[in-house]
Design a protein with these regions (language model features):
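Class I S-adenosyl-L-methionine-dependent methyltransferase module
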Residues: 36-37, 45-117
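Generic structural signal for well-ordered secondary structure
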Residues: 15-19, 41, 97
């Protein structure tokens, strides 16, 4: 059986697409007072170090989050996603890429639940 190590792919174009959509979905859920439940059945690491040997092998993040990191003005939907990525990266440098749990966590209200497997 082949093993999958997300550290090689963290922050690539697919992660950006998936996590941008996740931000939009969670924001839509927050429009109502009703609580929401987030279940991640394939939760990996909470964050991925982009300077690691794994991430450096193919440097897939360069065609994903790195292209967006230093953009100036962006649409609100993209700005929300980038704000969440910035929470994981205090300072100006892009060093870490958040996994889905860290993408969702800043949006959670007291009544919402998150379960990671």
């Amino acid at each position: 059986m082949l093993s999958y190590r997300h550290g090689f792919h963290a922050g690539n174009h697919a992660d950006v697409f998936k996590h941008l959509l996740l931000c939009l979905l969670v924001r839509a859920l927050l429009a109502k007072d009703k609580p929401f439940f987030f279940l991640d059945t394939h939760a990996g690491a909470g964050r991925y170090r982009l300077g690691s040997e794994m991430a450096g092998k193919n440097r897939e993040f360069e065609s994903g989050i790195q292209k967006l990191w230093n953009l100036g003005e962006v649409p609100e939907s993209l700005g929300t996603y980038l704000d969440v990525v910035r929470i994981t990266n205090p300072g100006r440098d892009l060093r870490w890429y958040p996994g889905s749990p860290r993408i969702v966590r800043p949006f959670l209200r007291e009544q919402d639940r998150m379960v990671l497997c």
